[in-house]
Each structure stands twice: as C-alpha cells, then as structure tokens.
Amino acid sequence: MATTDNVIERWNKLENPVPVTYNRNLVGIDIGGRKAHFKNENDQIVTESYDFIHIAPPQSAILPVVNSALAVQEDGPQKGWLNVSKDTLQHKVFPNVFGLGDTNGTPRGKTAATVKKSTPIVVHNLLHVIHGKPADKKFDGYTSCPLLIREGSAMLIEFDYDGNLIPSLPVIEPLKDSYLAWLLKYALLKPAYVATLKGHV
C-alpha cells in the first residue's frame, strides 16, 4: 500500500477534515487579527483566518547550484535543484558530479535518512566512474519521516520514490503511532540533530 493511499483513507474518515488548498504562497500575516494572506496561482490575494499556523518557508538548493549549469534548467518542481538521475544520483550533464542530500533534484528525500541510505550508492557509483565503469547501483528514494503525534507517541514512516512503505525496523508498525517510534526520535535522532548543529557529526 502506498503511504498516500493510507493517509487519504484515514483523512476521509475524519468528521471535520482540514481543507487542503494547493498552489498558494504565503505573502503576509496579520498576527493580531489572526489572518494569513496568500497569493494564488492567478496572482490574487486570498485571506484566511487561523487559530494556529505552521509555516514552512519556500525551499531551494544552495545559490551556487541554483545559479550554475549544475541545476535543472527546465521549468517544474525540480528547477534550480542539482540535475541528477534519481536512480544513480549521477549528474545528467556532468558525469563526474554526484549529489547527496537536500540539494538533489529528486522527487523525494531531503532528509538525513535519505543521505544515510544513498551515501553507499553514491560511493559505489563514483568509484565505478573513476575506474571507467558505468554507475550501475540504483537508489530507491528511501526517506524516513518520524511524525510526532503527542508526548510519548510517534509514527515512523519510511517510504520510497513511489510512496510505497519500506519499513526497516520490523518492530515498528509504520502506520500506527507507538512509544518505540517516539523513543527513537527523542533518544537517537534528536541528539544526532543537536550534534550536527554543533558540528560534531
């Protein structure tokens, strides 16, 4: 079952689901009035009231990639990101360039888990290219997303490019919240994130 199928099925069972709107960018907030102003795909400003708002800023690759021939040039969701094959993570124009992590123009996987799983593939393929062989090892797009449900409970969802579940820990049910998934997030992942911020990883 694809992850998205499960999410849609559960969403449809909610009595009052939150409305989902696409193709709008946040352009302003009236904090006192609890109003968020969005620009829609027709360049019209749409204002919505809110009780709670969580904002994810627009994402892009680093400017040295965006402003170079290394970036995807064609319009679309990958424009500006590193122009790599989603399978080999080898650059589509410059065969001696490979990508890792959140600068890649791949359909999914801008997480630390993606970097961890894709690094051995990139190393293998890079060594092959150095020795005159083709990059032959393929990456499935693995990514992992620990979702906190509440204090002491989380879901660990692991999936590939197509949204298919590919759990790596058999003791954690990917579509059910559990204390074990929460413990993994707080006991292992959180210290790793903090160490990374301090430059220790």
Summary of predicted features, one role per range:
Residues M1-R24:
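Rossmann-like dinucleotide-binding cores of NAD(P)H-dependent redox enzymes
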Residues Y22-K35:
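A conserved short coil-to-beta-strand element within the FAD-binding core of flavoproteins
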Residues G32-K39, P77-N83:
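Short gly/ser/thr-rich secondary-structure transition/capping motifs
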Residues K39-V46:
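A structured beta-alpha segment of the ubiquitous adenosine-cofactor-binding alpha/beta core
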Residues T47, L156-V201:
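C-terminal auxiliary extensions adjacent to catalytic cores
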Residues G80-F98, I149-L169:
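FAD-binding beta-loop-beta segment adjacent to the flavin cofactor pocket
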Residues L100-I149:
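A conserved FAD-binding loop/helix module that cradles the flavin
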